[in-house]
From Swiss-Prot:
It is an enzyme of class 6 (ligase). The lineage of its organism: Bacteria, Pseudomonadati, Pseudomonadota, Betaproteobacteria, Burkholderiales. GO terms for cellular component: cytosol. InterPro entries: aa-tRNA-synth_II/BPL/LPL (IPR045864), Gly-tRNA-synth_heterodimer (IPR006194), Gly-tRNA_ligase_asu (IPR002310). Tetramer of two alpha and two beta subunits. Keywords: Aminoacyl-tRNA synthetase, ATP-binding, Cytoplasm, Ligase, Nucleotide-binding, Protein biosynthesis. Its EC number is 6.1.1.14. Belongs to the class-II aminoacyl-tRNA synthetase family. This is Glycine--tRNA ligase alpha subunit.
Length: 325
């Protein structure tokens, strides 16, 4: 049986062999691996990029107090980014399933058309859900736009739902029953097998974080935080707020620090949404505000790489960024 952590190690080994940089998760609260700086920003511009990493993902509204067998407010994705998307990307993905021990002839693997969109990031792509014997385990996307900029070349993204994949491989119906790891310890009558489950690691976290997300997150503090993160992102993009005093301190466009503020604003918005503190009309407006910040950051990042001559291309010549109408 493949344990939860062995599954991750096998994916790491497989994608390492395909030339991917094995990176670490971004150390901020994000709702998906796509929000990682090494997907969102690296998809912009002409420079090639191959990376893979585990990303803890938080979606406050999806919490169920640890009572739902397959729905979590905190879970893991395994993210693979290939730019430009290779022609054999589907074969590479199927090869990764075989590396996990899946016999493709004995299992029903289906690609179901499901185009992807992330409104807050100004991003969308053509793609598919991958269903393994009737369960969605992966999202497959060809990025068309990121931060409102056309992707040239197209980036291929593969996002594995690690818990769901592990549940199938271990043949369990409750995520908390997943075996995270197992080992043997010496005992008085011989070796004793021990195991650590997903529930041992995360069940209490699901209960308490759900309680916070739905009942105790301070909305007044969250509204203030959102405004602060938004203002800081704008300041780092050189956008002066109306009525703000001119202190004479010019800030260069700092795309990477500004993007961190965008991510913080996004998570704050998700908490407000979970608390029911934002109306349907306000929700659309907040999403628009975050999207506008994402577009500013995307253009600033592109411009900064262009000034450097797109060093990972090996040439200074590259097409101009094209913003969608």
């Amino acid at each position: 049986m493949l344990t939860f952590q062995q599954l991750i190690l096998k994916l790491q080994s497989y994608w390492d062999a395909q030339g991917c940089a094995l990176l670490q998760p971004i150390d901020l609260e994000v709702g998906a691996g796509t929000s990682h700086v090494h997907t969102f920003l690296r998809a912009i511009g002409p420079e090639p990029w191959r990376a893979a990493y585990v990303q803890p993902s938080r979606r406050p509204k999806d919490g169920r107090y640890g009572e739902n067998p397959n729905r979590l407010q905190h879970y893991y994705q395994y993210q693979v980014v290939l730019k430009p998307a290779p022609e054999n990307i589907l074969d590479l993905y199927l090869g990764s399933l075989q590396a996990l021990g899946l016999d493709l002839k004995q299992n029903d693997v289906r690609f179901v058309e499901d185009d992807w969109e992330n409104p807050t990031l100004g991003a969308w792509g053509l793609g598919w859900e991958v269903w393994l014997n009737g369960m969605e385990v992966t999202q497959f996307t060809y990025f068309q736009q990121v931060g409102g900029l056309d992707c040239k070349p197209i980036t291929g993204e593969i996002t594995y739902g690690i818990e769901r994949l592990a549940m199938y491989l271990q043949q369990v119906e409750n995520v908390y029953d997943l075996v995270w790891t197992e080992w043997e310890e010496p005992g008085p009558n011989g070796p004793v097998k021990r195991r650590l489950t997903y529930g041992d690691v995360y069940h209490q976290n699901e209960v308490e974080q759900s309680t916070y997300n739905f009942e105790h997150a301070d909305t007044a503090v969250l509204f203030r935080r959102f405004a602060e993160h938004e203002a800081e992102a704008k300041r780092l993009m050189g956008v002066r707020e109306e009525g703000a005093a001119d202190d004479g301190a010019a800030v260069p466009q700092l795309a990477l620090p500004a993007y961190e503020q965008v991510l913080k604003a996004g998570h704050t918005f998700n908490l407000l949404d979970a608390r029911g503190a934002i109306s349907v009309t306000e929700r659309a407006a907040y999403i628009g505000r975050i999207r506008n910040l994402s577009r500013l950051v995307a253009q600033a990042y592109y411009d900064s790489r262009e000034r450097l001559g797109f060093p990972m291309c090996g040439t200074a010549a590259a097409p101009a960024a094209t913003e969608a109408a």
